[in-house]
Every structure is written in C-alpha cells, then in structure tokens.
Amino acid sequence: MRAGDKAVAASTRLIPESSLVKSNLRLRLAVPSLLAAVSFASGAFACSDDVTPALQQAAGAAPAPAAKAPAAPSAQAVTIDPGIPDYQAVQGVSGSVKSIGSDTMTNEMSLWIEGFKRFYPSVEIATEGAGSGTAPPALIDGTAQFGPMSRLMKSDEIDKFKAKYGYEPTGVPTSIDMLAVYVHKDNPIKSLSLQQVDAIFSKSRKGGIDHDIRTWGDLGLTGEWANKPISLYGRNAESGTYGYFKDHALFKGDYKDEVKEMPGSSAVVNGVAGDKYAIGYSGIGYRTADVRAVPLAVDAKSPAVEAVAEKAYSGDYPLGRYLYIYVNKKPGAELDPLRREFVRYVLSKPGQEAVVKEGYLPLPATVARKALESVDLAPKAGT
C-alpha cells in the first residue's frame, strides 16, 4: 500500500491498517443469513480506493465479448439489522451546526436532520450539498461541522487538515450505496462490463479496449439503436461520485470531453430519463421508473450483477461504496453534545430506517459499532 493510501485508510479510524483484509474496492460483506445479522468478512472493515486485482488484470487484457447476462434480480426486502439500537434522547443538546459536502447524501442528510429535530426541536442544522470535494475545505476552515462524502478523503485533503490541526479528520461510515450506470427505460442493453463502461466514458481507455465505443451499435444493439450516438451524462469534478467512478469504472483514466457534467445526482438521472439514447452514472438512491440500472460485470468473462441489496452486501456488485460523514475530532477529546448525538442518531435504528427510505442500504450492526467506536461512542452495555 502506498503512503498516500495508508493515510486514506487511517482516516477512517475504524481499525488498524494491519487488520484490513486486502485492497479491494468491493465492500466484502459476508451474509450469514441474507440481509440479517450481517457481518464483515474476517470481522474487519475493508475498504480501499485501490482497484481490485481483478480489475488490474483486466486493464492489461485484450477486449472480450460482452459480459454474460445476469439472472433475474431478487425481490428481497431490505431490513435493519436487529443489532442496531433504537435512539434515546439525552439532556443538554442545543445549538446550531452546518453540513457541507456530498450531493449524493443531500436527501439522507435532510431526513436525518428532520428525524433528529423530533428529539431536539431547538437545534438548527443547515445543510449544503455541492459535492464531496467541498467537505474537506469546509471542515478545515470551520465553516462546517459535518462533511458528508460519498468517497474517502484523498491523502492531500487529509494532509491539509492535519497541517492545520495536527491530527486527521474522522470518517464515519453511515450507509452503503451502489453507484449505478443508468440508461433510458426503453434501452434494450442487457449488461455491460467495466471495460465497456470505460470505453464509453473515457478517452484514456485504460480498461483495455483499444477503440472508442460511441454508438449503441458498437455494443451490439441493432435496428433503430445501431447508428445512434451514445449521449453521456455525469457529474462535475467536485463530486465524490465523479472521482469514485473515475477511479473504479474508468481505471483512473480521463473522462471524454463530451460528457455532460450535471450539477447533481438527480440531474444525471433526469437527463438520462429525458434522452432515449443516453447513459449516465449516479447513486442507486436516485433511481426512478424512467431509467434502468444496467447489470455490471468486473470483466467480460464474469457474470453481470444486478444493483440489488444482496449483491452489495455479498461484495459481488462491483461499484458498491460507503457513504461517510467526516468530523473534526481531536484524539482523546469528546465531541460536543450536538455532534455526538447526531452521529449516534444516524447510526441508530431510526437513522438507518431513513437510509432505507432513501433507497440506500443500512449498515450491519458490526459496522455501526465500529463507526461509533471511531468517535469514542462505544455502545452502552446491553445495547
């Protein structure tokens, strides 16, 4: 692991680096009983911004046929891990704070704030979702006390924070997202490999395909689709989604100049919904009836995987990721009551119910406990 990646991994403050299972962009969540009593493989939090070994091999591989079509998705309902505690209000919570960061998490933050204020009506929490890239500077200069991010902080962002405060920011995982590749609901494409996604969106084509994919016919579609140019929708550089997709779907290559950079996650989905020949990427929580999430394969020899809950928990869906709230917490010092209780609320049963309501996946109890421990909020005995 490179020095910069060590800093990124350390910034989560969940477990020591030596406990990481291995560099893997997948969530690596084990499911003893589907979507119930979920725990991490090896009992450890494993998350890295490095590409998987499978993707690294694929980057040097020759182009292969389209990914195998997936089986029909399961209709398994998403439930809250019974080990997640309910929330109990405490005395002494007041004041006002601001949240600046991820657009992907804007709706989640709004629901969390709404639920939190039912317990503490006098509290004021303002939220601004301009992109994950706005969170680190806001935390550094103190204009925000919460920094929602749809990616881990980069090592240079951590370095700037540490240069001012002498310690690293703390990233608290709050929920699980599946970054989806969307097409219009009438598009007949069955599946895509990440190498095909790369050749569609990237001018670098580091995935291994040696030619641009510019029309739907290049992907094997016939009839009216054969000669239709693919219209590209994405996010801007301030977005954590932009960076995550660049790293994990484009093999750290550069976007094509013709990608339409939309101001938010919903704008991407709306753009695709209104453009029959479009393709775009956004969080699964923004899916609507007018678009379809295309099943994705790690490479052309692997089966394509639907963007469904059990495939994220099992680690099979290739673009699963954690969504974080970063806070400025000095080691050994307690968070103030407002920030402390908001974090506790997010990781409680009602907080995780809000996650499900927004179309994201709730944390396993094991992960929620580690997240609480990362900010010195170990669960009380009996919880």
Predicted regions and their residues:
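N-terminal acidic, proline/glycine-rich, low-complexity intrinsically disordered segments
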Residues: 2-4, 22-24, 47-49
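Extended interaction regions within the primary functional domain
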Residues: 3, 7, 39, 105
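Bacterial N-terminal signal peptides
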Residues: 32-43
